[in-house]
């Protein structure tokens, strides 16, 4: 599907515009091939999931994965793509394993992934050249940081992908009742646009970006807490539904860890939840993992260094907002407490910037906060940073281009249409010059590549 989308887009947009400059007679298939390759490189994590990628020939795959401009969040995606491509027609493609692995930058993979995944892969075990590539990667990790330049080849060179312009998607929310409206903010143009509405009203949902799509998970439709999940495709400007969660959840936390979507805590209409479930896009199924130690509704979540954090919230039992924070280790499938925040926060906006966890605003009973604190997993400690310009609870949060954005929310008396962002270098918050068209709290926020 993604390859076809790239071809259609290029044929309708890029190719005709370039042809105006070259002249139709000079417009070659080489230019068309270049444009399509550029699209595939920029959207590789999405492309690698499709049958069209698996049907590419050897030279086409090598051309893609050897490029310094390939857009991937980690080299794991490239390794997984190679394994999938080989398995698609294993009998005829097995002989190409070494040629493909020559372009996978194994030294840039985490050591744990090399040991637990790469070394255990049968296709690697049965190929001497591939085993040599693995040994090279392990040697690279054994060297002190200042000596790693001694192993200098294309596999040790970090990729430098072409960055695509980003837009921010603000999904649903409460204004003052649950709404279907979805707004899109173009950072470059400083402009808000309405995009495809949700299939049904939804506020207090968990919203995340995963593998090229935006997921709206659970929430409240104005009458009931729901377990349904809708997925937004920016290329098509269209929402579709996928498998529902096991439990109804509103005011939940949602995050992505290791290509799995986690739904954390929340409120089912009668009680706060400690349960946690996760969604696999490969099987379109939800399954439970270990529950938290504390029931948490209005909880904020974030992922740092392979761990999932649940921040503050409301437990319903003590009838107090929480300052406690829990950390989930997916390998051990267990939750453990880490350092408490300095203040109780329910409905805090939680986001991750530069490897640190931010908790912005929230409330403690009737007191709505504008204070912000930051957690450093390395020191297991929280510190205060500058206050926001406005008191906010139940706001959406996202990080993009080195800034942390806090979107909407309410100040205790009215829903907010304003957005402000934090600059960690200056320790300063700045209001965006333009507001959303609708003041909304309990909206979800995600950042995606600007649809072409």
Protein language model features and the residues they cover:
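A detector of repeated loop/turn-to-beta-strand junctions in beta-rich toroidal repeat architectures
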Residues: 165, 179, 202, 225-226, ...
């Amino acid at each position: 599907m993604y390859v076809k989308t790239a071809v259609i887009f290029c044929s309708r947009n890029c190719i005709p515009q370039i042809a105006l400059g070259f002249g139709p007679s000079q417009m070659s298939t080489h230019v068309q091939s270049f444009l399509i390759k550029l699209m595939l490189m920029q959207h590789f994590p999405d492309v690698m999931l499709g049958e069209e990628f698996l049907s590419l020939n050897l030279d086409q795959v090598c051309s893609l994965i050897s490029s310094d401009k390939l857009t991937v969040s980690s080299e794991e995606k490239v390794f997984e793509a190679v394994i999938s491509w080989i398995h698609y027609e294993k009998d005829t493609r097995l002989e190409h394993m070494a040629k493909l692995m020559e372009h996978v930058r194994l030294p840039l993979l985490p050591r744990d992934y090399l040991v637990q995944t790469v070394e255990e892969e049968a296709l690697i075990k049965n190929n001497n050249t591939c085993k040599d590539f693995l040994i090279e990667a392990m040697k690279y990790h054994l060297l002190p940081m200042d000596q790693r330049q001694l192993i200098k080849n294309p596999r040790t060179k970090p990729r430098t992908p072409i960055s695509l312009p980003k837009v921010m998607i603000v999904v649903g929310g409460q204004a003052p009742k649950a709404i279907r409206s979805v707004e899109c903010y173009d950072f470059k143009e400083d402009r808000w646009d309405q995009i495809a509405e949700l299939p049904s009203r939804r506020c207090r949902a968990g919203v995340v970006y995963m593998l090229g799509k935006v997921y709206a998970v659970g929430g409240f439709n104005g009458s009931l807490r729901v377990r349904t999940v809708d997925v937004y495709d920016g290329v098509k400007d269209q929402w579709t539904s996928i498998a529902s969660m096991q439990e109804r959840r509103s005011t939940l936390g949602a995050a992505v860890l290791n290509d799995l979507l986690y739904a954390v805590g929340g409120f089912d209409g009668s009680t706060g939840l400690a349960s946690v479930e996760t969604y696999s896009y490969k099987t379109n199924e939800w399954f439970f993992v270990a529950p938290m130690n504390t029931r948490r509704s209005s909880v904020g979540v974030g992922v740092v260094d392979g761990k999932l954090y649940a921040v503050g919230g409301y437990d319903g039992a003590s009838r107090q907002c929480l300052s406690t924070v829990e950390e989930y280790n997916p390998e051990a499938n267990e939750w453990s407490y880490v350092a408490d925040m300095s203040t109780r926060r329910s409905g805090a906006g939680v986001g991750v910037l530069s490897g640190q966890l931010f908790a912005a605003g929230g409330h403690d009973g009737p007191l709505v906060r504008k204070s912000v604190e930051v957690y450093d997993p390395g020191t297991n400690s929280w510190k205060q940073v500058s206050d926001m310009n406005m008191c906010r609870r139940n706001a959406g949060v996202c990080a993009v281009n080195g800034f942390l954005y806090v979107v909407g929310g309410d100040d205790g008396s009215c829903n907010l249409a304003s957005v402000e962002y934090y600059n960690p270098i200056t320790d300063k918050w700045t209001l965006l010059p333009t507001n959303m068209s609708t003041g909304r709290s309990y909206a979800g926020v995600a950042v995606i590549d600007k649809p072409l």
